[in-house]
């Protein structure tokens, strides 16, 4: 529920008609930490699930490992494209998981994960990070692999938020401005 509240606050701020300037940058990592905590809660719930919580077939997910030397050499748009492709892949994977899982308690975690992915995209928009949606299907996106279980998908989700998404937010130009 708190993820939905955070998302609604972001959307309301973004769509407010009297707002003469773009959404203020959301540089506070506590916002991302909140999404990570909820992802960890979903991962824990999945690990305790015994019935109705399987993935009917493997799904394409982003690689979560980061070679920091390679990451530092990428330009901002390449980093943004990689993270947004990963967020898109995760959203597709969660939508598929939703159709595979019959456990009602897990449905709420899956729905919350999808809302939080949309919220992370809204945070990126607030940082003036150009939106990117992959044109290819998931298998054609570079830097992917297949998750064969729901628990594996949730682990990828947590690691992606903790890794590449966090690095992109830390590097965001809008957050680098001196506030003196």
From Swiss-Prot:
Residues 1-20 form the signal peptide. Keywords: Disulfide bond, Erythrocyte maturation, Glycoprotein, Hormone, Secreted, Signal. GO terms for molecular function: cytokine activity; erythropoietin receptor binding; hormone activity. It is found in: Secreted. It comes from the Eukaryota. One of its GO terms (biological process) is erythrocyte maturation. Pfam families: EPO_TPO. Glycans are attached at residue 75. GO terms for cellular component: extracellular space. InterPro entries: 4_helix_cytokine-like_core, EPO_TPO, Erythroptn. Disulfide bonds join 27-175, 49-53. Belongs to the EPO/TPO family. Erythropoietin is the principal hormone involved in the regulation of erythrocyte differentiation and the maintenance of a physiological level of circulating erythrocyte mass. This is Erythropoietin. It comes from Tetraodon nigroviridis (Spotted green pufferfish). The lineage of its organism: Eukaryota, Metazoa, Chordata, Craniata, Vertebrata.
């Amino acid at each position: 529920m708190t993820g939905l509240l955070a998302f609604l606050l972001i959307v309301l701020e973004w769509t407010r008609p009297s707002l003469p300037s773009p959404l203020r940058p959301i540089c506070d990592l506590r916002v991302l930490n909140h999404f990570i905590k909820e992802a960890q809660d979903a991962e824990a719930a999945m690990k305790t699930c015994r019935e109705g919580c399987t993935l009917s077939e493997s799904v394409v997910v982003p690689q979560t490992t980061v070679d920091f030397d390679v990451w530092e050499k990428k330009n901002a748009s390449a980093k943004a494209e990689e993270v947004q492709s990963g967020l898109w892949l995760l959203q597709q994977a969660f939508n598929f998981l939703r159709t595979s899982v019959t456990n009602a308690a897990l449905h709420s975690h899956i729905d919350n994960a999808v809302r939080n992915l949309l919220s992370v995209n809204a945070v990126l928009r607030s940082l003036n990070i150009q939106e990117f949606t992959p044109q290819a299907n998931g298998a054609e996106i570079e830097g992917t692999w297949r998750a064969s279980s729901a628990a594996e998908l949730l682990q990828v989700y947590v690691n992606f938020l903790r890794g590449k998404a966090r690095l992109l937010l830390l590097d965001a130009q809008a957050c680098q401005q001196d506030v003196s």
